[in-house]
Amino acid sequence: MDMAQYQPGQRWISDSEAELGLGTILAQDGRLLTVLYPATGDTRQYALRNAPLTRVRFAPGDEVTHFEGWKMTVREVEESEGLLVYHGLTAQNEQCTLPETQLSNFIQFRLASDRLFAGQIDPLPWFSLRYHTLERRSQLLQSSLWGLGGARAQPIAHQLHIAREVADRMAPRVLLADEVGLGKTIEAGLIIHRQLLSGRAGRVLILVPENLQHQWLVEMRRRFNLQVALFDKERFAESDASNPFEDTQLALVALEWLKEDERAQDALFAAGWDLLVVDEAHHLVWHQDQVSAEYALVEQLAEIIPGVLLLTATPEQLGQDSHFARLRLLDPNRFHDLEAFRRESEQYRPVAEAVQELLDHGSLSAGARKAIHGFLGSEGDELLASVEGGDEEARSRLVRELLDRHGTGRVLFRNTRAAVQGFPQRELHAYPLPMPSQYEELPAGEHPDLYPEVNFQQQWEDGDDNNRWWRFDPRVEWLIDTLKMLKQFKVLVICAHAETALDLEDALRLRSGISATVFHEGMSILERDRAAAYFADEEFGAQVLICSEIGSEGRNFQFAHHLVLFDLPAHPDLLEQRIGRLDRIGQRHTIQLHVPHLENSAQQRLFQWYHQALNAFLNTCPTGNALQHEFGPRLLPLLDGGEDKAWDALLAEGRARREALEAELHSGRDRLLELNSGGAGEGEALVEAIEEQDDDFALPIYMERLFDAYGIHSEDHSENALILKPSEKMLDAGFPLGDDEGVTITYDRAQALAREDMQFLTWEHPMVQGGMDLVLSGSMGNTSVALIKNKALKPGTVLLELLFVSEAVAPRALQLGRWLPPQALRCLLDANGNDLAGRVSLETLNDQLESVPRVSANKFVQAQRDVLAKQFDVAEGKIVPRHEERVARAKQQFAAAMDEELARLTALKAVNPSVRDSELDSLRTQREEGLALLDKASLRLEAIRILVAG
């Protein structure tokens, strides 16, 4: 096409994305062509010289459709200033004119028949690959696991329940407040991933404290294959774009930088986001008479971004005022009065007790009956009567109804270790060691005893190895001896500083020959991946991984259960973060904590504080942050000295205060909230479904077909792992292999969790989805001719196999794929026009087929062209009733689902103000638009296979 012939208003179709419907040329600007696809609302820009577009030009005899729905048969085509005008007759035989600008956006084309008659006949395996790709894509879009089963994480019930519950809402606004170690970041990642896959969100902004940026980057990339753009002062300043944020689907920004840079704030406000995620939201300070700059900034963003996820510490840790401040960000109209919020919270206590009695399966107390009646009225009385009659389904429904009406149950999710099973025990091993004379001679400074080696690292940076600190520090000798005793186990060593980690690696290598690898913030993500993989390798890997404080963020090593704390961090939250590298749900062994410390030093006193006052080694310490604030000013001076009597008194006071706070937390536990957050059994069903999907061989079988078709060479790497490399016959350089040199993959979840250097292939992985997109967006496989060897068929008999796709073209956010996913409808015509597809499967046919040389195949097609064209129409006549039946069923199911959810939320709003009006309005709009687009669902000829008996 001559570039000058592109004109605004012309209609073109994408060769690679036919599902977008008819495109309209918007503009030709320099070397770029802009095309709008009104059916889906998408806009694409193409390089002018090689735009993958085909001009839509109907011929006399073709039937065309106006965007209002009426049809006409073309009699004449006129061209005026580059635009086509069609003249013809309506169904009522009335003359009419239809400019191409007014064509329906939903028209589809028989590209398969065009290619067949043009002699473009594909290799035999491609037809099957296209069919299986269509079938699998259809199943995936309907799957309840879509967006939940592909994460590199152990499937955990409460996480999956929260992710599905939140991600399936339009513009969710919720608070994730699980206790430490329960995986809030994974929950957020699952929600982001599912929202992106479903189309409910297109652009996501993640705000985090600066020290957590790397953790988020690693978690999103490693666990969810989400490519997040990390923005900081330098990247923002270096960008040539008028708004650097606008070209980014997923942006990660540090709150500390953002609050200081007004230009960045303005750009962020103008960029247009669908979902805002804020980590460590409890650090946003709010009081009734004053708010912090960080809180005000997040508040502004929350006002203009439809969806908001706040990740925060548990409400009990924060206190009710601070907790109210987070809820106020989510819905300022609902949470506007702190005192009213306090009163409302008290009302739910008797309901929680009633739910607990229901779950205990005992007889209900009078108080429980009263609470249920007060909360649910006559509906509750009916369910209660059924429960007493032994109806277990009624019991489950009654629990669900009570949970649904819980005041903050729709906006707040909080799981506790007490409510979630599966955590390991911890054992503590303390090793007091003598203070070396070299450290005793150090000048007084800011707690030099905590990290005394730092002074020697600075002093002897380029000095004699014999004088290095690790030659005389008794902790190093102890470490070598301990590692030798534990030589059959993997051991994780964590210390505060990167320099210390590097020194320890030197010490182990030079003094003992123990194989160790390091992990610190100065390494690239790729270098850390390699170090983690070397540590994880059971056969040839390192026994020891030495991590710095920051370097270990975001990494979990559950395959190890021995943790050496070479020194102690100055904050209890950091201590919990260290232990959390091993102490996760799914850890199969008791965590062995090894803590060396120097006697009569700050190290020893900090150990005593954490152990005796906070009990932070043997249990998680939800009160640690509060106790640090309360006791910090008195604790720090006593670490370096002070009388033993004063120290013992502080330990006793700290222990008493911790026990009092823990008692308050326990009595204040919101059991109703815990039950709602845990999912009351729904999460367990999702876990079972994911495990069943993991055990299915469908994905490896499909991927082998895909690799063969595209010329990707696969070879064994080790058990459950393959190496993929592009071969000399690689068909498409655009295949999403991820690395031109090759990649190592595994389909095994356990292997993927232990080996982060391997790609974990699931149906959601970009390589799998990208490969499927390549198949369906291209034309390969939509024409094929084969010889069928079957004694029951007379030689020369022709069978015609056609694949039609029944689909609704719609914006992804409407989720119509759940009710009417694109589905291949197969027709197998014999010479008499009978459809044999119901009796003869595609796989049965495949076993009887042989390839035909392309030249011979083309000669046959051209000779039979007129006969084949008529049979296409016969086949379409057979398929249309099936398509119409699918559409009718989809409309019925879609309307029923929407009506049920509208009724539920409307009833809920009467008793639970946390249901927003915007949610109801959005659902009503979604219902109307969805039904209208289902009415326009189309049928297109996707692929043709001609079978000649021989």
Curated annotation (Swiss-Prot):
SMART domains associated with the record: DEXDc, HELICc
Top EC group: hydrolase
Gene3D superfamilies linked to this entry: 2.30.30.140, 2.30.30.930, 3.30.360.80, 6.10.140.1500, 6.10.140.2230, P-loop containing nucleotide triphosphate hydrolases, Tandem AAA-ATPase domain
Listed GO MF terms: ATP binding; DNA binding; helicase activity; hydrolase activity, acting on acid anhydrides
Pfam families, alphabetized: Helicase_C (PF00271), RapA_C (PF12137), SNF2-rel_dom (PF00176), Tudor_1_RapA (PF18339), Tudor_RapA (PF18337)
Biological process terms in GO annotation: regulation of DNA-templated transcription
InterPro entries referenced in this protein's UniProt entry, alphabetically: Helicase_ATP-bd, Helicase_C-like, Helicase_RapA, P-loop_NTPase, RapA_C, SNF2-like_sf, SNF2/RAD54-like_C, SNF2_N
UniProt function note: Transcription regulator that activates transcription by stimulating RNA polymerase (RNAP) recycling in case of stress conditions such as supercoiled DNA or high salt concentrations. Probably acts by releasing the RNAP, when it is trapped or immobilized on tightly supercoiled DNA. Does not activate transcription on linear DNA. Probably not involved in DNA repair.
Subunit-level organization: Interacts with the RNAP. Has a higher affinity for the core RNAP than for the holoenzyme. Its ATPase activity is stimulated by binding to RNAP.
Protein name, UniProt field: RNA polymerase-associated protein RapA
Native species: Pseudomonas aeruginosa (strain LESB58)
Gene coding for it: rapA
